UniProtKB/Swiss-Prot annotation:
GO terms for biological process: cell wall macromolecule catabolic process; cell wall organization; peptidoglycan metabolic process. Keywords: Cell outer membrane, Cell wall biogenesis/degradation, Lipoprotein, Lyase, Membrane, Palmitate, Signal. It catalyses: Exolytic cleavage of the (1->4)-beta-glycosidic linkage between N-acetylmuramic acid (MurNAc) and N-acetylglucosamine (GlcNAc) residues in peptidoglycan, from either the reducing or the non-reducing ends of the peptidoglycan chains, with concomitant formation of a 1,6-anhydrobond in the MurNAc residue. SUPFAM superfamilies: Lysozyme-like (SSF53955). Its main location: membrane. Its EC number is 4.2.2.n1. One of its GO terms (cellular component) is cell outer membrane. A lipid is attached at residue 17 (S-diacylglycerol cysteine). Belongs to the transglycosylase Slt family. This is Membrane-bound lytic murein transglycosylase C. Murein-degrading enzyme. May play a role in recycling of muropeptides during cell elongation and/or cell division.
Length: 358
């Protein structure tokens, strides 16, 4: 564990010595990425040692996972499936461990910067405005804001929903509950004022911002990824974050705590969309074709998008400008070298259509 804690301190500092030259920036990028990969490897190994080979569960873009009780208890919110699962391998009074984890999960606030997902610290602050308020209803069909109601619901779940399974040498006790059917819309609504503010500030469509957020994180402000993309719009510090800071006349790159703040994250993600839209891909004349290119670039970079059409960037823009938007879409979704980027354009485009109807 000392290794993990040391890496938590070291990883954010790995880029601090980089200069302004491209070579220095690239070296910083490699160090930062390698540092984070080492941290994740250590963390996964630690979980495997405690829970077993088939029980490794780590936070992701659409999965909130928080360990407590010396890593013996964990809370998992699957924002795609709309489920909350609280589990423990504690051998003494597992119900008590589950009860505490259920209560703190139901009442946690929406300040991702205050919670360390890579430690077992019980650092979850109970909030008067819980992040999950309205997304979970108790056994009486009521939303949960107060500790007494969360405690009553936890007791109900333990009496009626507690499950037991065996995995390797461990007996795992768990409780699973469902989010309300429209949980995605409820989370999206929470961030609408910030989305509208950034849309107006940077000249980016609200529907596009919302579609990106849905696809990237399912509106999970705690979102992290294996590539160290952070927050609602999954902004990477040393790529998009650096470009946005340069646009704002700032040196360096945003910190993790900066990007875990929802307002900062939406601002940075939207600013980056505007950079793609107006700078990197500004030569694309048709707005729909440009939007397809921007969406794909948000996932895989503008350079890789243009190279689908030509190795020469100017020639690529000319080729796109002589194509119908539907052909641009077809080309990007079939010929982009990254399968993830090909699927990403389809997902975001579909999500954006649904937000345009609202």
């Amino acid at each position: 564990m000392k290794k993990i804690l040391a890496l938590l301190v070291i990883a954010p500092l790995l880029v601090s010595c980089s200069g302004n030259k491209n070579q220095a920036d690239n070296e910083a990028f490699i160090k930062d990425t390698n540092g984070f990969e080492i941290l994740m490897g250590q963390f996964a190994h630690n979980i495997e040692n405690i829970w077993g080979l088939k029980e490794v569960l780590i936070a992701g873009p659409k999965d909130y996972v928080k360990y407590t009780d010396q890593y013996q208890t964990r809370s998992h919110i699957n924002f795609d499936a709309g489920t909350i699962t609280v589990e423990t391998i504690a051998t003494t009074d597992p119900a008590a461990h589950l009860r505490q984890a259920i209560i703190t999960t139901l009442l946690m606030g929406d300040d991702p910067g205050s919670i360390d997902l890579y430690s077992d610290a019980n650092d979850i602050q109970i909030s008067k405005e819980p992040f999950l308020y309205g997304q979970v209803l108790d056994n009486n069909g009521e939303p949960i804001r107060w500790e007494w109601r969360a405690a009553h619901f936890a007791d109900y779940l333990l009496q009626n929903k507690m499950q037991k399974r065996t995995s390797g040498l461990h007996v795992i006790w768990s409780v699973t509950l469902q989010l309300v059917p429209n949980h995605l819309d409820k989370r999206a609504h929470k961030y609408l004022p910030l989305v509208r503010q950034s849309a107006e500030k940077y000249g980016v469509e609200e529907s596009l911002i919302l579609a990106i957020m849905q696809t990237e994180s399912s509106f999970n402000p705690y979102a992290v990824s294996g590539s160290d993309a952070l927050g609602l719009m999954q902004v990477v510090q040393h790529t998009a974050g650096r470009d946005v800071f340069k646009m704002k006349g700032k040196s360096g790159q945003p910190s993790r705590s900066y990007l875990f703040d929802p307002a900062n994250n939406i601002d940075a993600g939207t600013a980056y969309l505007s950079i793609l839209q107006n700078t990197y891909l500004g030569g694309i004349q048709n707005a729909t074709s440009r939007r397809y290119a921007v969406i794909t670039s948000y996932n895989g970079g503008a350079g890789s998008v243009l190279r689908v059409f030509s190795s020469d960037k100017n020639q690529a823009v000319n080729i796109i400008n002589n194509m119908a938007p539907g052909d641009v879409f077809q080309t990007l979704t079939t010929k982009h070298p990254s399968g993830e980027s090909r699927r990403y354009l389809v997902k975001v485009n579909s999500a954006q259509k649904s937000y345009r109807r609202h």
